[in-house]
């Protein structure tokens, strides 16, 4: 029987933290921590005979993710608004640092053919297109009221965000930006944490969409990981590389910002590279 693993709360916390940042994927962090395949299989198996082991694995992950989103939403609102460039450089370092790990576990030198490299290019192109689709969040935080049309919009946004969250390289929060609801959702989270429940209907609409997206997309991803593993990994590598385009905030504007941005970029790269090596050694 699958046992409750307390360490998975920390892994879920790391995934939830990354999903607060537009352009950074919780799926990428799951890969880096060596739990991606089991995470997808558990979500896919939650409505099957594998319910209990799937449920037991997912509970600490979900607890960690909720803790991260509840405790860090205000911090990331501050960092992204006041220190945007250094923050995004740090996550850019994390993303680049995972690429060697992905190449190693896919054994690309001997396994990849022309079609696999074409899938890598396709993944990069898809992320660039998604990034260019971003229409911002111009009305974020202006209101927490809902209409029937907005309920449908938040549900669809949540569904697409959770589907994206499961794919390394595609950020769930970035998909919320594409739909123009990221800022409002972040405001709703921060208000609910303060026990102001005016934003709760928004979170429920998004939450039900997230649940639907998880159920549907996990089964699709699980199928491709099982039956077309190399092609899927090639696409994932493309997504991860392409996500650099999504997180690039522009160049620093002064020497101090250049220094800070480069330092945190290197820190992010080293952290990601080290975790990737540890995960690869333990597989």
What are these regions, as identified by a protein language model?
Residues 1, 27-31, 63:
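A short N-terminal beta->alpha junction/helix N-cap motif
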Residues 2-14, 55-56, 60-163, 201, ...:
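Juxtamembrane transmembrane-helix boundary motif
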Residues 14-24, 159-173:
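Transmembrane alpha-helix interface/packing and boundary motifs in multi-pass membrane proteins
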Residues 16, 20, 24, 32, ...:
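Generic N-terminal helix/loop capping motif
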Residues 19, 28-49, 172-198:
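Interfacial segments of multi-pass membrane proteins
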Residues 21-24, 45-54, 80-84, 132-141, ...:
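Short juxtamembrane and helix-loop transition motifs at transmembrane-helix boundaries
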Residues 25-29, 129, 174-175, 274:
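Generic hydrophobic alpha-helical membrane-span motif
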Residues 31-33, 166, 170, 217:
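Long, contiguous hydrophobic alpha-helical segments, chiefly transmembrane helices and signal peptides
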